[in-house]
């Protein structure tokens, strides 16, 4: 669990995004410069990505070169999505929000 105020801000962003979009999950990412990005799952026909991959795509579109942390709330991301993040930046902190609003390391 993290008590880092910056990670708790990501929790707030992810929860607000999930609530605002009425989505089953949302993710918030902080890059190594402190910029933040949010995303929800995307589905269009046969194409589907969870919120973890969606937030990575949004961040990569802004040319990030490192990830500090990602917080996912709602539906747990697929193991393959977690692997993508770990291979993108092995030092990235990755958390899932528990029902008690605690950050659990993935």
Segments the model singles out, each with a brief description of its role:
Residues 35-36, 103:
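Hydrophobic "anchor" residues
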Residues 45-60:
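A short, polar/charged loop-to-alpha-helix boundary motif
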Residues 25-35:
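Short beta-strand scaffold segments in enzyme catalytic cores
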Residues 29, 48-49, 70:
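Residue-level detector of alpha-helical recognition elements and their boundaries
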Residues 2-23, 57, 62-106:
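C-terminal binding/interaction regions
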């Amino acid at each position: 669990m993290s008590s880092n105020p910056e990670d708790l801000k990501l929790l707030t962003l992810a929860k607000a995004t999930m609530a605002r979009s009425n989505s089953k999950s949302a993710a918030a990412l902080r890059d190594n410069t402190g910029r933040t990005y949010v995303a929800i799952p995307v589905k269009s026909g046969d194409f589907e990505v969870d919120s973890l991959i969606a937030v990575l795509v949004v961040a990569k579109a802004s040319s990030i070169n490192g990830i500090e942390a990602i917080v996912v709330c709602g539906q747990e991301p697929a193991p393959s999505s977690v692997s993508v993040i770990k291979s993108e930046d092995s030092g990235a902190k990755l958390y899932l929000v528990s029902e008690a609003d605690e950050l659990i390391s993935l």
